[in-house]
Structures are given as C-alpha cells and as structure tokens.
Amino acid sequence: MSVRSVIRGSGSALPRRAVSNAEMTTMVDTTDEWIVERTGIRNRYIAGEGETTSTLATEAARKALEAAGVDASRIDLIVLATATPDQTFPATATIVQHNLGCNGGIAFDVAAVCSGFLYALATADSMIRSGMARCALVIGAETMSRLLDWEDRTTCVLFGDGAGAVVLEAVDVDETDPKAPGILATRLHADGAHNELLYVDGGPSTTGTVGKLRMKGREVFRHAVTNLANVLKEVLETTGHDAEEIDWVVPHQANFRILDATARKLDLPADKVIVTVDHHANTSAASVPLAYDTAVRDGRIKPGDLVMFEAMGGGFTWGASLARV
C-alpha cells in the first residue's frame, strides 16, 4: 500500500456579469465572426464591484468542499494558483483560508499563470505524499480582466474571470491495482527564454504599477501545440498508459485552435476533449479546474475515469497530470 492524492470533489465560481461577443463589439473594434473564427470564444465573465480573486476562490472552494463531503476544519493545506492576487501580499490563499475558517494549516500562492493550477496540483500532491498534509484545497482563481488593456482588441477579447477548486485527500491504495484512484504522475517544465511573448508590462520591483497583459499570439500558438503534445506524451510514458486509454483530456482553455491542434497531434478524438473556452474564454489558472468541474457536474466525467490535465502559460511554463478520478 502507498499514499496517493485522490480528488474528492470539485467546485467553481464565475462573476455575475456575462459579456457576449456582441457586447465586446461595442467596446472595441472587433466582430463576433472574427473572435469566433480565431478563438472559438463566444462569451466570458467579467468581475464587478465586490468581486475579487479571493471571493471567487472562496466560492469555488466552498462548492468543492460540499461536493467532497469534507468539512473546512479538515483542510490542512491550501495552494492557490493566481496571477491576479488581491494584494501583492499577503498570499490570497491566506485570505481564502480565513474566509473558510480553517486557520492554522499551510496556505500559499503559486504563480505560473495559465499553468498555475498544474503547478499547484503537483505541489499539493507532493506535500500529501510526503506526509506534510492530509487534506488539501487546490485552487485556480483569476480576475484577468483587471490586467487587460481594453483598447487592445487582440487581447481583451480573449480573457475572462473565474475560479475552480478541487479537494485532494491522502488515501492508501494498492499501486498494483490499475483502477486505484489518485494522481498517477505530473510533469512540469519552464523556459524563461520566451517570456517576452506573453507577459505583463509592470510589477512592484520594476514599474511600481500593475501593468497590462501583452502577447504575441502567433508565436505562443506555435510553442503551445508542440510543448503540450510533448508533455502529454511524457506523462503517458511515465505511467505506462496509452493515449487510447484516456477517458478525458481537460486542457487549459486558451483558444479552440490550440485545443484542436494538440488533440490532432496526439490522435485524440475531439469528443474526448473537454471544451469550455466558448463560454468562459481564457481564465488563466482557473481554466483547468473550471473546465473539470463543469464536466463533472454535467455528468461527462465520472468516478473511475482516467483524466489528463494539461496547460501552458506565460514564462513559458507548461505541464500535464494524469489522474484516476
């Protein structure tokens, strides 16, 4: 027997305000056809007054706890992935911890932008396997709208706000049982040589400002497809599974073209890929858990399914994780 981190439940949260492509056309020089053709996005949610990264994260966490049947008092670790914290410090995870009333455990943020949830998941998994924690909340939460240049039509139409969370619990499993639940393997990578392709042009130690998001979309697309396909293969090789065994792929919801191209490169059927980018747009670190929770709640992802999570973000950072849920 050995310890694995098992996903016990998931939750998600969205701001109140939905913004359609039609509404976007009143804000910037664009069209619904242009946005849909290039990205697949039709809608996004934008945070309003009183809605912050921590409020969205707290709501998603509460829903995940409810789905898992776990009381907040049992949570001894919160890892929150975000590029849009409420404040430079303290960590937004500590605010969520206080909101949930589970003070005293471990709580911190990780910053890997769109790959953030996978970095957070790997961190929590490692801490559970090492015995430092037994029951964890892993959260991806963003208010990306507050980093956008609303005069840059090439970027402001792509992003939205939201949060997703999962409860991870330490469980003793028989590793020889192919159906045993838990996270099987995660692989993470980064390459800072390309940080000028996707970045925010501000920060506390440089400009003293928040800054705005800047992106060179074509170059990002090229790197994304190659890196994601390679890291998925790496995880499959590590676990000894074949692509045909995967029940569902839950990718970072950046752009439908990237999702489609990556699936084609791995010969994965399109109907095995969870797609929510049309409804949520790119929610950065929130997109993977938000898509996962959507598919769990609508009945597509079921207990016992083999699920591959994957993402790539600014830095570049990228990774993939395979789990039996």
Curated annotation (Swiss-Prot):
Matches recorded under Pfam families: ACP_syn_III, ACP_syn_III_C
Domain of life: Bacteria
UniProt entry keywords in alphabetical sequence: Acyltransferase, Cytoplasm, Fatty acid biosynthesis, Fatty acid metabolism, Lipid biosynthesis, Lipid metabolism, Multifunctional enzyme, Transferase
Gene Ontology molecular-function annotations: 3-oxoacyl-[acyl-carrier-protein] synthase activity; beta-ketoacyl-acyl-carrier-protein synthase III activity
Gene3D superfamilies in the cross-refs: 3.40.47.10
GO cellular component labels: cytoplasm
Active site: C114, H252, N282
Pathway: Lipid metabolism; fatty acid biosynthesis
EC annotation from Swiss-Prot or TrEMBL: 2.3.1.180
Region named ACP-binding: 253-257
Record's subcellular location: Cytoplasm
Similarity comment: Belongs to the thiolase-like superfamily. FabH family.
HAMAP family cross-referenced by the UniProt entry: FabH (MF_01815)
Function of the molecule: Catalyzes the condensation reaction of fatty acid synthesis by the addition to an acyl acceptor of two carbons from malonyl-ACP. Catalyzes the first condensation reaction which initiates fatty acid synthesis and may therefore play a role in governing the total rate of fatty acid production. Possesses both acetoacetyl-ACP synthase and acetyl transacylase activities. Its substrate specificity determines the biosynthesis of branched-chain and/or straight-chain of fatty acids.
Entry-linked NCBIfam families: fabH, PRK09352.1
Domain notes: The last Arg residue of the ACP-binding site is essential for the weak association between ACP/AcpP and FabH.
The protein's assembly and partners: Homodimer.
Protein name in the entry: Beta-ketoacyl-[acyl-carrier-protein] synthase III
Organism: Novosphingobium aromaticivorans (strain ATCC 700278 / DSM 12444 / CCUG 56034 / CIP 105152 / NBRC 16084 / F199)
Gene: fabH
